[in-house]
Amino acid sequence: MQIILLEKVVNLGNLGDIVKVKDGYARNFLIPNKQARRATKEALAEFEVRRAELEKVAAEKLAAAQAQGEKLAGSTVQINQKAGVDGRLFGSVTNADIAEALVKQGFAVEKAQVRLPEGPLKLVGEHAVQISLHTDVLVDVTVAVIGEHV
């Protein structure tokens, strides 16, 4: 299916690009999330009329994400979790736990924005985690997992 991207999509293209994707990806994800639109003649004409407005909105989102990223960059989040004597956690620290701790500190972060490349944290100590505030804005945050010995 040919679609017009209404915003930048990772591994696909930028605002205004016309790309071919699988029908299910377009119908079930991109179009419902208002990230794309079918590439018909009418849609292309309407897009060209609204292009400046969409670019302005995209620039505002990027600026807001960069401002939040500057505040968030280099910060440390402490999470208490029950742990054994050897430093392994009972359970793990997930992206939802990290997002919740950041929200308590006053940052608007959703769990889908937290990137844990090695999976959930299972050891006591400091871990580097990335927060994806925008497709172009990645921020490094330190998560200090403090073990409560049982």
From Swiss-Prot:
GO biological process assignments: translation
Entry's Gene Ontology molecular function annotations: rRNA binding; structural constituent of ribosome
GO cellular component, one term: ribonucleoprotein complex
Keywords from the named record: Ribonucleoprotein, Ribosomal protein, RNA-binding, rRNA-binding
One Pfam family named in its UniProt record: Ribosomal_L9_N
Function, as annotated: Binds to the 23S rRNA.
HAMAP family: Ribosomal_bL9
Listed PANTHER family: 50S RIBOSOMAL PROTEIN L9
Family named by the database record: Belongs to the bacterial ribosomal protein bL9 family.
Protein name: Large ribosomal subunit protein bL9
Organism: Paraburkholderia xenovorans (strain LB400)
Taxonomic lineage: Bacteria, Pseudomonadati, Pseudomonadota, Betaproteobacteria, Burkholderiales
